Amino acid sequence: MAVQQNKKSPSKRGMHRSHDFLVNPSTAIEPTTGETHLRHHISPNGFYRGRKVLKTKADE
């Protein structure tokens, strides 16, 4: 079992944990429909960068 050699001070503990926060994923707005979607992903309507690239059930 691992045993620490020296106690980590509160300051060093905070510095160690400084990158453990969660970040919201960046989103983009589709210019044709105005819907938000993940960047570099197809919008729910099947549009990507202003072009229809996927048929959806609503199209049929």
Swiss-Prot record:
Question: Residues annotated as region Disordered?
Answer: 1-60
Which family does the entry's similarity section mention?
A: Belongs to the bacterial ribosomal protein bL32 family.
Taxonomy, superkingdom: Bacteria
Give me the stretches of Basic residues compositional bias.
Answer: 49-60
Q: Does the keyword GTP-binding apply?
A: no
Q: Name one GO molecular function term.
A: structural constituent of ribosome
InterPro entries, alphabetized: Ribosomal_bL32, Ribosomal_bL32_bact, Ribosomal_zn-bd
Q: Which SUPFAM superfamilies match?
A: Zn-binding ribosomal proteins
Tell me which UniProt keywords the record has, alphabetically. Ribonucleoprotein, Ribosomal protein
The species this protein was found in: Bordetella petrii (strain ATCC BAA-461 / DSM 12804 / CCUG 43448)
Q: Mind telling me which PANTHER family this protein's record contains?
A: 50S RIBOSOMAL PROTEIN L32, LARGE RIBOSOMAL SUBUNIT PROTEIN BL32
Residues in a coiled coil are: none
Q: Which Pfam families match?
A: Ribosomal_L32p
Ribosomal protein listed as a keyword = yes
Query: Where is this chain compositionally biased, Polar residues type?
Result: 24-35
- Gene Ontology cellular-component terms listed: large ribosomal subunit
This chain is encoded by the gene named: rpmF
- Name by which UniProt lists this protein: Large ribosomal subunit protein bL32
Q: Name one GO biological process term.
A: translation
